[in-house]
UniProtKB/Swiss-Prot annotation:
<comment type="subunit">
    <text>Heteromultimer composed of HisG and HisZ subunits.</text>
</comment>
<dbReference type="GO" id="GO:0006427">
    <property type="term" value="P:histidyl-tRNA aminoacylation"/>
</dbReference>
<comment type="similarity">
    <text>Belongs to the class-II aminoacyl-tRNA synthetase family. HisZ subfamily.</text>
</comment>
<dbReference type="Pfam" id="PF13393">
    <property type="entry name" value="tRNA-synt_His"/>
</dbReference>
<comment type="pathway">
    <text>Amino-acid biosynthesis; L-histidine biosynthesis; L-histidine from 5-phospho-alpha-D-ribose 1-diphosphate: step 1/9.</text>
</comment>
<dbReference type="InterPro" id="IPR045864">
    <property type="entry name" value="aa-tRNA-synth_II/BPL/LPL"/>
</dbReference>
<dbReference type="InterPro" id="IPR004517">
    <property type="entry name" value="HisZ"/>
</dbReference>
<dbReference type="GO" id="GO:0004821">
    <property type="term" value="F:histidine-tRNA ligase activity"/>
</dbReference>
<keyword id="KW-0028">Amino-acid biosynthesis</keyword>
<dbReference type="InterPro" id="IPR004516">
    <property type="entry name" value="HisRS/HisZ"/>
</dbReference>
<keyword id="KW-0963">Cytoplasm</keyword>
<protein>
    <recommendedName>
        <fullName>ATP phosphoribosyltransferase regulatory subunit</fullName>
    </recommendedName>
</protein>
<dbReference type="GO" id="GO:0000105">
    <property type="term" value="P:L-histidine biosynthetic process"/>
</dbReference>
<dbReference type="GO" id="GO:0005737">
    <property type="term" value="C:cytoplasm"/>
</dbReference>
<comment type="function">
    <text>Required for the first step of histidine biosynthesis. May allow the feedback regulation of ATP phosphoribosyltransferase activity by histidine.</text>
</comment>
<dbReference type="InterPro" id="IPR041715">
    <property type="entry name" value="HisRS-like_core"/>
</dbReference>
<keyword id="KW-0368">Histidine biosynthesis</keyword>
Amino acid sequence: MSAWVLPDHIADVLPSEARHIEELRRGLLDTARSYGYELVMPPLLEHLESLLTGTGEALDLQTFKLVDQLSGRSLGLRADTTQQVARIDAHLLNRQGVARLCYCGPVLHTRPDRPHATREPLQFGAEIYGHPGIEADIEAVLLSLECLRSAHVQEVSVDLADVRIVRSLLAGLPVGMHQLAQVHGALAAKDASELASLTRDFPSASREGLLALLQLYGDAAVLNEAENLLKPFPGAREALSDLRAIAARMDGVRVTFDLADLRGYAYYSGARFAIYAQGASDALVRGGRYDEVGAVFGRNRPAAGFSLDVKQLVGVVSAPSLRAAIRAPWGDGGALSAAIATLRRQGETVVCVLPGHGSEVDEFHCDRELVLVDGNWVVKAI
């Protein structure tokens, strides 16, 4: 195999795309900061138990594992940053009130999580800890929408669901893990006959409620129908009320609901959302409430947030035009170097042409040049 061939679903990022990614990264972090979120930078490598305790099988399978040559302990390359930020909130910051944290860094996956995806996403996310109320959920959704607006993403739509609905329908039932997984699978596939078979011994209210979920997807009218069908279940009613409150704050955005959507069931503890956009084959943003995320670190704080892959975002957002540069001759100092330094401090890109390379073309289009006129270095159009 050639030495330059990279592993499957791993790629170099070349200059034009790298510039676009970096501009998006800066814009996302600036947007999060404008909401009061503080930047943290967890390590790419951690002890395996810190990365995986309480996260479920899916993240375990996505995590690259190795042995620490210093300690002999098992290490993991993070496949998701949320667990690390929860550790930071629980043990390093240890604040009593609200903590707003954001991050942006690479994660590694053993397998791509969607067709044609990279196994090295650049994950951006924002999380708010310490507030159990619906306000934190709303802020997470609004911030994620503002992040997409800052990136000039067009025609977004938000899909809402809440794991508490299914949990309330199953509460108190003697359902084993295997049967629970089968019920979840039938709900995800919207397979009414399979779900009816699996729930034939359930109490009628729970059985009818679960079967009704298969039809409860669409616009806000779904919530009205669900409230009528799920009256015997207080947890479901609370979840529906929260979904209505979240949707009410999203002016000018198309909002849909799928009350049988169980993605992240083992992870989320309340409302969850996914944001789609024109040109994207999958959700650009996923987030929600995950109050149990810090429990494994001994500090079970309320938490809500979201994450996205900046590399995926690049695929649906046009790169802004690169500002034309100024071409300048190579010099050893004096007035020429001073003129170049002044232009760069003013925000201009000045490309010095090295000896023997005057006719070469690079990524930076130069529409001006620095020339010597009457003993002074001045900028002229090419």
